[in-house]
């Protein structure tokens, strides 16, 4: 399965909306993914242009969450949220929590933002889906700019880019340097959820997480008793594709010490 962004065809599909076509489905009222297609992954080391806050206190969360109050915080982060399937599930499972999806690809993040807007308008429930939002950013560079020390309760890394080539393993989103940043924004007792269909990447994640002094892996019975665990397999678009193709899932959950 070729996933390294630099090995992919750089050409993306034409955005139908730009050609005057309506990207919104007349049946579901939701944006159609075919108008937002982009290559599978993006180079995290490339010099993308991002606006980002100088410090967490500068983030205007109210612009993303209309109902958030000054004493409330974003506590769940889906890193590399893709097309937002799992992010939507988080919003439904935890209506009292504010969850953010972070995605580096511009068309994909546009899709998630449009999807959330459509869900908010479509839902008849007051406040529905106003607890989820998406940011286009590079989480490998700017995570501490958004979150204060110990702010997050849960972080999710679902089907990240494997960067198969050995020379590019340093680009993997789980590495020793970044694990220290994740530990900084995670509260003690907070959880890191990882899922991949690539066994080599799974072994890499487990090795690096277990070698880091600020994490411990949950026992299998703890993983299976977590109500989020069943959702990790199919809620994301990538996870659903693995299920359709009868592929393997490799799960590991870690606790911040």
Swiss-Prot record:
EC number(s) per entry? 2.1.1.33
Q: Which GO terms describe its cellular component?
A: nucleus; tRNA methyltransferase complex
Q: Which InterPro entries match?
A: SAM-dependent_MTases_sf, Trm8_euk, tRNA_(Gua-N-7)_MeTrfase_Trmb
GO MF:
tRNA (guanine(46)-N7)-methyltransferase activity; tRNA binding
Positions of S-adenosyl-L-methionine binding: 80, 103-104, 138-139, 158, 236-238
For this UniProt record, the keywords arranged alphabetically read as follows: Methyltransferase, Nucleus, RNA-binding, S-adenosyl-L-methionine, Transferase, tRNA processing, tRNA-binding
Q: Which reaction does it catalyse?
A: guanosine(46) in tRNA + S-adenosyl-L-methionine = N(7)-methylguanosine(46) in tRNA + S-adenosyl-L-homocysteine
- Pfam families the UniProt entry points to: Methyltransf_4
Positions with biased composition (Acidic residues)? 1-12
Functional note: Catalyzes the formation of N(7)-methylguanine at position 46 (m7G46) in tRNA.
Q: What is this protein called?
A: tRNA (guanine-N(7)-)-methyltransferase
Q: Give the organism the record lists.
A: Drosophila ananassae (Fruit fly)
